[in-house]
Amino acid sequence: MPKILIVEDNELSRDMLSRRLRRKGYEVLVATDGQEGIAMTQRELPDLVLMDLSLPDLDGWEATRRLKKDARTQHIPVIALTAHAMSGDREKAIDAGCDEYDTKPLELRRLLSKMVRFVEDPEAKAGETPA
């Protein structure tokens, strides 16, 4: 079961996304700011990080840069999540080290299509029959 870390300061967004991903079969961890996201990534080594870019204290841009500079976590894919869909934001996220980018409000189908580039789809695996 792929382990997903959601780094999101908005409680409603965090809870809704974590519930929806758990229903899809993912193991979900949550962090509420960039510092906690870095610490949890280093400790738990998730398969994927969903990183809000607008976080208090340490924003998602800097948290991602730090994760990508750390030899223990640089291999972990990060998908940037942002409500700021301004021209150039996707490029800025990729430059910060994000592997993919998605905008809020999140559409689960669109997000899942991006996630499966990096982690297995637990529902697809559950539907497979053993050989």
Give the residues covered by each predicted segment.
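Residues at the ends of beta-strands that form strand-to-helix hinge/output surfaces
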Residues: M86, T103-K104
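Conserved acidic carboxylate
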Residues: E8, T32
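The feature encodes the CheY-like receiver
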Residues: P56, Q74, M86
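Charged docking surfaces used in two-component/phosphorelay signaling
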Residues: D15-R23
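Active-site residues of response regulator receiver
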Residues: D52, T82
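C-terminal output helix
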Residues: P105-M115
